[in-house]
Amino acid sequence: MRDTKERIQSEALRLFAENGYQAVTVEQIAAAVGIKAPSLYKHYSGKRAIFDGIVHQMEARDLQQARRYQMPEENGTAENPAGETATMERVCAFSRAQFRDWTEDKFLSRFRRMLTLEQYRDPEMARMYDQYLSAGPVGYLTDIFRPGVDSREEARLLALAFYGPMFLLYSLYDSGERNAAALLDRHMARFAKEHPALAVRTQKEG
């Protein structure tokens, strides 16, 4: 039964990424899995339940990745700034892994494409797009860079300078740019070189 549930999630996400969440029906998902719609309802109550399962898996993987690279698990607060547990080396390693996963991992790349496709059609999808791919990463990096600079505004500008090219490289990768990961490596190396004090001060705060 677990295998069938996983296949349903996998095929549903593939269809969502190709056609958009709104355009896909339960019948189409069932057909892609090779079962009848009534059989699908034995595993999920409907399309929304399948989507919720996908999001739950996404959240679990995101948390696992943060722990693997010893990164803060969420944006910092005044009492517990995210930058206190991060170093520039970890930020770069974590960002490389995130980029690789968002482009090469089947599950994550499809999730990203689904959000990209649906962000203008569905307010919830737009919120999730911001959370995972736009405002969320910028806010996360702003908190991480804050201990190394004089103001939050400066930290936000650094976050934009660091993440902006990475964000653009997602689109270039989707357009066929297979050197995207190498370009990201060069960008991060240059960023660290141009901001050596930031790297040292952030590390000292860890």
How should these model regions be labeled?
Residues 54-94:
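Amphipathic alpha-helical linker/stalk segments
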Residues 62-66, 106, 123, 166-177:
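Short amphipathic alpha-helical interaction/hinge segments
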Residues 81-104, 109, 113-117, 156, ...:
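Amphipathic alpha-helical segments that line or abut small-molecule/effector binding pockets
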Residues 103-116, 120-149:
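Amphipathic alpha-helical packing segments from all-alpha helical-bundle domains
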